[in-house]
A protein has these predicted regions:
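Residue-level signal for inorganic ion chemistry
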Residues: 27, 58, 98, 102, ...
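Glycine-rich phosphate/pyrophosphate-binding loops
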Residues: 32-44, 190-203, 224-238, 451-454, ...
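Conserved phosphate-binding loops in nucleotide/dinucleotide-binding enzymes
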Residues: 81-85, 180-181, 199-211, 238-271, ...
């Protein structure tokens, strides 16, 4: 049985966006599942769009996501080089084969002449086809002119796509196209076919936008006498409204931005796997190992998948909750509030253990934890905005805080003892938990939410808790 080999072949033209990552994830999952090879190839032949540093950004993004490659930049392999600009000699060999077999010719026309052909076709209200202007006696190709593919046969192609099923396209999609540009570099249409064949790629998995070009690819495969690989086109990632492809105007961001915003790599991969694939069950949260085990191309949907950032945040929260506390501690090093800098690691881990379940992203950490490191300034508008507390007059709230202060002064400061003291306060004040606990929580944190009150007070400690209660009492409105 032939070993499965897949690839991801990005162009270094800028940041990696969501669609790029999914185009890397699906072939990576398939290769990992089948114990095959996953090749990273940098398609850098379009020098006009080349962005300095983009290759390094691609590599670092894949590193962060945990998408490792069997062959490619940094790791090498038997099928290198893995940058197309370093493979010119390979394209020259295959180009010469096409010339020798009568399937390629040097393009003798100037841009002005080509434009004249286009203008004439437009005036005659017909489609412009380059094959209608093939030179009868083209010059010998010396590498300074563009080299064009001479489509051998104008026919309808039918092929099977592992996701989309049987597809067909007619002669209207076929025309003579450039194989090698005048700068000596190949076009994508030519280079990727040569590279995939020489690198032993068995499954070509890419975006749906490539379907329209399939007839020209298939024609070139046949002219090169190369067996077709398995093709799989992934459905579009749609904007939230489901009406168009996701774009920058719809809030599409680079993966690096999501990383900065505190999204976990495993959550991002889980989310992107669900953009067009499911395992047929109700399961939504997957580990990387589960994705590798369950992934299959026949479970990839044909229709577009909506990009729902709220779902990404939900998944991220789920993955944060699953992390071991020491692992999470390593990941939040750069997300702590500045006031945490002098705290011990032991104390920060204790704080993290309390707030872990409330984090949707790592950037939520400062808001969820800052009051553990510095006494906040009282904000009594939070009491008036609270559904339970706004029913009580400020004087009543101050009285409750005084009672709580008195009770907690004589309480051992561990969660169980604090809970018992709070229960006693409920009985003595006749208040509901929602009212009593809310005012104490506000007084010590001035935050809309906090972990369980006994745990919060115990971690703050008796001295800090009593001091904050007293500050709240002293600052309480008188009317």
């Amino acid at each position: 049985m032939t070993k499965i080999t897949t690839r991801f072949a990005p162009s270094p033209t800028g940041y990696i966006h969501i669609g790029n990552v999914r185009s890397a994830l699906f072939p990576w999952l398939l290769a990992k599942q089948q114990q095959g090879s996953f090749i990273l190839r940098i398609e850098d032949t379009d020098q006009s769009r080349y962005v300095e540093g983009a290759t390094e950004l691609i590599l670092s993004t894949l590193d962060w996501l945990g998408i490792n490659w069997t062959e490619g930049p940094r790791v090498g392999g038997p099928h290198g080089p893995y940058f197309q600009t370093e493979r010119r000699d390979r394209y020259q060999i295959w180009a010469q084969k096409l010339i020798d077999n009568g399937f390629a010719y040097a393009d003798p026309y100037t841009p002005e002449e080509v434009q004249a052909f286009r203008d004439k076709a437009k005036a005659e209200k017909r489609a412009f086809l380059y094959r209608d202007h093939r030179p009868e006696n083209p010059p010998s190709w010396d590498g300074t002119q563009p080299l064009r593919f001479k489509v051998p046969e104008i026919k309808r192609y039918t092929w099977n796509d592992a996701v989309m099923g049987e597809l067909t396209a007619g002669p209207e999609a076929l025309d003579d196209f450039i194989l090698i540009k005048s700068d000596g570099l190949p076009t994508y249409n030519f280079a990727h076919i040569v590279d995939d064949f020489e690198m032993g790629v068995t499954h070509v998995i890419r975006g749906l936008e490539y379907i329209s070009s399939m007839p020209k690819y298939l024609s070139l495969y046949d002219a090169l006498e190369i067996e077709w690989p398995v093709f799989a086109c992934l459905p579009h990632i749609m904007a939230a409204d489901g009406k168009k492809k996701l774009g920058k105007r719809d809030g599409a961001k680079s993966v690096e931005e999501y990383r900065t915003e505190g999204i976990l790599p495993e959550a991002m991969l889980n989310f992107l796997a669900s953009m067009g694939w499911n395992d047929g069950t109700e399961q939504e949260v997957f580990t990387i190992d589960e994705l590798i085990e369950k992934f299959s191309l026949d479970r990839v949907q044909r229709s577009g998948a909506r990009f729902d950032e709220q779902r990404l945040l939900w998944l991220n929260g789920q993955h944060i909750r699953r992390l071991e506390i020491n692992d999470l501690s390593q990941r939040v090093v750069n997300f702590w509030p500045a006031t945490a800098s002098s705290a011990s690691e032991e104390y920060k881990i204790a704080v993290l253990s309390l707030v872990q379940d409330r984090l949707k992203t790592l950037t939520d950490l400062p808001l969820s934890s800052s009051y553990f490191f510095e006494a906040p300034t009282p904000d009594w508008t939070m009491a008036t905005d609270n559904k339970q507390l706004k029913k009580l007059a400020p004087a009543e709230l101050a009285t409750l805080l005084k009672t709580a202060h008195t009770t907690l002064e004589t309480t051992d400061f561990n969660p169980d003892a604090i809970q018992a003291a709070l229960n006693t306060l409920l009985e003595s004040t006749g208040q509901k938990p929602g009212t009593l606990f809310s005012i104490i929580r506000l007084a010590v944190s001035w935050a809309p939410f906090s972990p369980a009150l006994p745990d919060t007070l115990a971690l703050l400690g008796k001295e800090q808790t009593l001091a904050r209660l007293q500050t709240a009492i002293d600052s309480a409105p008188t009317a």
